Amino acid sequence: MRNKRAVVVSTNYSDNYFFFLPLIHFAWQKIGWDVICMMPGKENKKRNFVLSSIIDKAPYAPALTIITFSCSEENEVLYTQCSRLYAGNLAVPEYEVIMTGDVDMLPLSNYWNPARDKITVYGKDLSDEHYPICYAAASPEKWREIMSLTGNVTMDIDCDLDYYTIVCTDKWVIDQEILTASLGLYHNEIVYVNRGKSPHSDYPIGRIDRSAWVASHKETERIDCHMPRKGYSNENWPLVLNEIKENLNPTEEEINWLEQYRNDYIKIM
C-alpha cells in the first residue's frame, strides 16, 4: 500500500479491457490512488504478463491488490462487471476510502477527494434512475455494511445475482441496480458531487469520450477519459498515449515503459 485511497476496477481477459489495467494503474498512482482489481481467478499467460508488467517492470513502486472470484465462463462478463461492488470483502483495512471506477476510464486530474466518514457519489445529477458506478466512494467498513458483505466474494456475488438476474431485464445495468438498491437506505448520508453535462458532447463535464472524441476535446476541464477500444491498435494507441502525456506529466522513463508495454502486449495476444 502506497496511498490511503484505492480505486476499484474490474476486468476479465478480453483485450478490449485487460490491456488497460497497467495504464489506469499508472494513472491513478500518479494522482495518489492505489488500485484494487477484481478479476476471474484463472491463470493464463496473458494474465501473468500484464500483472508482471505492473509489479516487476513498472518505473514506480506498484500498489496493486488483486481480488479474484469464481464463475462460469457463461457468466464471466456479468460477474466481472458487478464484482467492483464487493471489494470491501478483502480490501486492505488501512485504506481510508475505496471508490468504484472503470478499467477503461483513465483519470486525467486529481478531481476526486471523498471524505473517509462519508459516502460520496459523483455524477448522480446526470442519472435519473441509477447511482453511477463511476464513481461511488466510502470507507471499506462502510462498503461492507452497504453491501452486506460476508467475507466471501464469490458467495456474495452469487447471492445478489441469483436475485437480480431474475428481476432485471437489462443485464448491462445490473451492477447499477445493485448499487442503487444498496444505497437506497443511505440516501441521507450521501454527499453528492454534481458533474454537469458538457455543452459540447452531452457527456459529463471534463470527460473525454471515445464516442465523441473530437467534440469532447472542446472541453477546457480534464477529469477522465473513456478510452477507445482496442487501445493498443495503431489507430487508438497514439490517442491514449497523448492523453497521458498532456494530462499526467509522465517522465521519459515512464513513457518508454508505456510504449514497451503496449508493444509487448501485442506480441502476447
Question: Which residue ranges define each predicted feature?
Answer:
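N-terminal anchoring/stem segment of glycosyltransferases
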Residues: 1-73, 256, 264-269
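Short, hydrophobic/amphipathic alpha-helical patches that form generic packing surfaces
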Residues: 22-30, 90, 177-185
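Hydrophobic anchor at the start of a short beta-strand
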Residues: 35, 98, 190-191
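Short, solvent-exposed loop/turn segments at secondary-structure junctions
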Residues: 13-15, 42-44, 71-73, 104-107, ...
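Catalytic core and acceptor-binding pocket of nucleotide-sugar-dependent glycosyltransferases
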Residues: 144-266
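GT-A fold catalytic core of metal-dependent nucleotide-sugar glycosyltransferases
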Residues: 80-125
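Short beta-strand-to-loop element that shapes/binds the nucleotide-sugar donor at the catalytic cleft/hinge
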Residues: 117-143
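Conserved glycosyltransferase catalytic-site signature
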Residues: 78-85, 172-177
